[in-house]
Amino acid sequence: MPRILLSFLLVYSLTIAQAQETIPFRITKYNNILVSSVVNRKDSLDLMFQIAMEEASISPERKRSADHIVFKDGISDGNTVTIGKNIYRDVRFFDDELTGHEADGKIGTGIFKGKIFGIDYDNNRFSVYETMPSLKGYQAVPLVNRNGQLFIQAENVIDGIPVAADFLLQSGYSGGIIYSNAFADGKDLDQKLKITGEKTLRNSAGKSITTKNGILPLLKIGNFTLKDVSAGFFTGDLKTQKASYLGADVLKRFNWIFDAERKTVFIKPSKYFTEAYFKMN
């Protein structure tokens, strides 16, 4: 093979593995990812990235105007969202959905639909790829896509016994993990975990729900092990927690690369891997 052609192919192979798009973000003190956006070329909004949804939404508590997003029955279709140099079209917004601190609304994974994308916590950016980038140092973890919501399995070591659970990736929750009622019931977590705080609420019918925060000694994701993980669960009459959450305080401890089909995610520890956990009130 001629040397010039060989050199061209080498350069080309390196080029296609590089990011086709990069989107800068910032991380709030509540562990949420925020991107600066302009919607419909008029409304400047800070949107929280919510990995647990595909569409976008506007918060009733927003501080900035969103007058150029026109809603009908709580839904607005056909919007254009500009983030940095990237323009995303036909974005659906929902109205009046609460979001994280400092944000005017949320934006989901729909802007990456059909593409490989990465969350790079080390460099505060999303990366979008046409082909899979280098996976050196990464480990493959099976991913389950349920109606646009992404789940992975992790092993919880409770009282010395490993127990598997499916976790919804939930970047809107600032803490470590939350257990579903189905997982927590019958496991005596308030006795087997070190409890760091609790709060009880009652509804108008007198039914109660108690939020308890504790410390899980070990959480294993693939071959990676996190220690002393902040873990929340609920007790009481009301059973409202349908899924276990892998929250933002765990998500940020890894860099993530999602395949285009959302069947596999590749993870490796980030600079936050051993950082102290966020304290939930």
Over which residues does each language-model region extend?
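Pepsin/retropepsin-fold aspartyl endopeptidases
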Residues: 18-281
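Bacterial Sec-dependent N-terminal signal peptides
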Residues: 1-24
